[in-house]
């Protein structure tokens, strides 16, 4: 059946709005699938039906803007609509829901349908939930990783080694890629770093780099830039590298699901797809991180290493201290300013510098650039000499930014509120989750100037009335919201040496 097209400004990738009488004539209900065919060019996609009795008249079809990207229809043109077959991937998802193991072919079918929008958001959520309740074993993780790579773009460099680095997240202020990438590239190695934007954090690496330069490039452009200057820091979502991963992450977000198997596949698929054969994984360990204990960290590290071996990649993991933020800044502009200051020669903050050179040093040792045990010093020498700054400026320039940018050019939001210590004592705890929440309330990462600047960290003796941290915001209402809601978060806890006094029974 043919219908007149009306383009709806809805970004959903796979959807169509039909009058309920037209849907009945086609033989479909709400949530069913139809095949949409553009008669001009024979392009066809599958879309999920939503019915209406008022928003669409009979004979017209409301095609979502996201769906039309693959059909190239214009308003008023005709479209052919047919009932679509039920995808086989739904049977495989049901198999996983029932506790079964997925084969290589079944996993590939599911991921192909994810990429081609053959399954709905609800069905993808069912797959994610099934994999969370019935965890993937290592063979299934390998199948998932390879399927993610196979259904997207890949980069193949003419020579090796190709280095990459990833942090599993959970720690605010973890801006180390802004140092690690230029240090490694300045050593003569190649590091095509594709990064994520923040979903639950105050600033992903891509959000930070976007303060300085464009981060949206194709896979081919990433390869060309890496060949020219040795490294990139780009947003992976623009490259079509492992595209299924981005869609899975979006469905995980509302439930805060972070299934172990899918996390392993997510990280390693992107590294494999950019051609990396040497990978360093940062696993922050701490009470308010994704990995609460060293034992859990070692277990996760072994899983990354095993998956790497299955893929022909050498992986080393660093268990890093995650109970406090990295450095003193949280939020895009604040973190970028802190990173530039270190690249320009600042010798603080030590936590930021030490973590960055340690991870860069592992990569240098893995590649053979440095002997075992000397990598961190080599990384420190590259940083101290100014070679890392020079390389970072080259990366900024090739990505379309200003290579002459200085730390003082990067400013926080104009609205600020200082939080002072309520009593004298030691800072005994810094709650990473609360700090991230507070920075997001202030507007980060969308508002680049929003965030938190810490004035003291865990273990510091502080007097009543001295500043603990400053909240920055670009909009006054955002600052007020952060201050009001932040009163219940207690992101920094100060206690005296005397915790309590227990009197004798005679004094009770």
From Swiss-Prot:
The keyword Chloroplast does not apply. GO terms for biological process: AMP catabolic process; pyrimidine deoxyribonucleoside metabolic process; pyrimidine nucleobase metabolic process. Its EC number is 2.4.2.57. It catalyses: AMP + phosphate = alpha-D-ribose 1,5-bisphosphate + adenine; CMP + phosphate = cytosine + alpha-D-ribose 1,5-bisphosphate; UMP + phosphate = alpha-D-ribose 1,5-bisphosphate + uracil. AMP binds at residues 170, 196-201, 205, 266, 290. It is an enzyme of class 2 (transferase). It comes from the Archaea. GO terms for molecular function: 1,4-alpha-oligoglucan phosphorylase activity; AMP binding; pentosyltransferase activity. SUPFAM superfamilies: Nucleoside phosphorylase/phosphoribosyltransferase catalytic domain, Nucleoside phosphorylase/phosphoribosyltransferase N-terminal domain, Pyrimidine nucleoside phosphorylase C-terminal domain. The keyword Nucleus does not apply. The active site is at 258 (proton donor). InterPro entries: AMP_phosphorylase (IPR017713), Glycosyl_Trfase_fam3 (IPR000312), Glycosyl_Trfase_fam3_N_dom (IPR017459), Glycosyl_Trfase_fam3_N_dom_sf (IPR036320), Nuc_phospho_transferase (IPR035902), PYNP-like_C_sf (IPR036566), PYNP_C (IPR013102), Pyrmidine_PPase_CS (IPR017872). GO terms for cellular component: cytosol. Keywords: Glycosyltransferase, Transferase. PANTHER family: THYMIDINE PHOSPHORYLASE. Belongs to the thymidine/pyrimidine-nucleoside phosphorylase family. Type 2 subfamily. Catalyzes the conversion of AMP and phosphate to adenine and ribose 1,5-bisphosphate (R15P). Exhibits phosphorylase activity toward CMP and UMP in addition to AMP. Functions in an archaeal AMP degradation pathway, together with R15P isomerase and RubisCO. This is AMP phosphorylase. It comes from Methanoregula boonei (strain DSM 21154 / JCM 14090 / 6A8).
């Amino acid at each position: 059946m043919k219908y007149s097209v009306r383009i709806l400004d809805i970004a959903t990738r796979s959807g169509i709005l039909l009058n309920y009488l037209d849907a009945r004539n086609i033989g479909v209900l709400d949530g069913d699938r139809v095949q949409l065919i553009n008669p001009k060019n024979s392009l066809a996609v599958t879309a999920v039906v939503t019915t209406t009795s008022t928003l669409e008249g009979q004979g017209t079809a409301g095609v979502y803007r996201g769906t039309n990207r693959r059909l190239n229809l214009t308003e008023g043109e005709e479209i052919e609509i047919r009932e679509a077959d039920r995808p086989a991937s739904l049977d495989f998802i049901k198999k996983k829901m029932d506790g079964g193991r997925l084969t290589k072919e079944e996993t590939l079918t599911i991921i192909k349908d994810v990429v081609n929008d053959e399954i709905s958001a609800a069905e993808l959520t069912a797959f994610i939930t099934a994999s969370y309740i019935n965890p993937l074993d290592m063979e299934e993780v390998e199948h998932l990783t390879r399927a993610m790579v196979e259904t997207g773009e890949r980069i193949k460099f003419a020579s090796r080694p190709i280095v990459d680095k990833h942090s599993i997240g959970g720690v605010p202020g973890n801006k180390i890629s802004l140092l690690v990438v230029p240090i490694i590239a300045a050593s003569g190695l190649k590091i095509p770093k594709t990064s994520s934007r923040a979903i639950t954090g105050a600033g992903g690496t891509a959000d930070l780099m976007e303060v300085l330069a464009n981060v949206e490039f194709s896979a081919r452009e990433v390869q060309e830039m890496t060949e020219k200057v040795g490294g990139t820091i780009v947003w992976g979502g623009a490259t079509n590298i492992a595209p299924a991963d981005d869609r899975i992450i979006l469905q995980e977000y509302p439930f805060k699901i972070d299934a172990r198997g899918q996390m392993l596949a997510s990280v390693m698929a992107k590294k494999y797809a950019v051609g990396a054969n040497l990978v360093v994984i940062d696993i922050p360990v701490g009470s308010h991180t994704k990995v609460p204990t060293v034992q859990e960290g070692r277990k996760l590290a072994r899983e990354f290493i095993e998956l790497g071996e299955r893929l022909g990649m050498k992986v080393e993991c660093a268990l890093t201290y995650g109970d406090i933020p990295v450095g003193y800044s949280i939020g895009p502009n604040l973190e970028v300013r802190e990173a530039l200051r270190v690249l320009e020669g600042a010798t603080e903050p030590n936590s930021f510098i030490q973590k960055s050179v340690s991870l860069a040093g592992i990569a240098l040792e893995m590649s053979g650039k440095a002997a075992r045990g000397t990598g961190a010093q080599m990384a420190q020498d590259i940083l101290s000499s100014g070679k890392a700054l020079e390389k970072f400026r080259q990366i900024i320039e090739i990505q379309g930014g200003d290579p002459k940018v200085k730390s003082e050019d990067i400013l926080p939001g104009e609205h600020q509120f200082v939080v002072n210590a309520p009593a004298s004592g030691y800072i005994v705890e810094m709650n990473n989750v609360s700090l991230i929440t507070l920075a997001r309330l202030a507007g980060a990462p969308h508002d680049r100037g929003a965030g938190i600047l810490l004035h003291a960290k865990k273990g510091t003796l502080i007097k009543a009335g001295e500043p603990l941290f400053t909240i920055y915001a670009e909009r006054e209402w955002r600052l007020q919201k952060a201050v009001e809601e932040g009163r219940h978060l207690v992101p920094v806890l100060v206690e005296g040496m005397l915790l309590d006094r227990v009197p004798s029974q005679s004094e009770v």
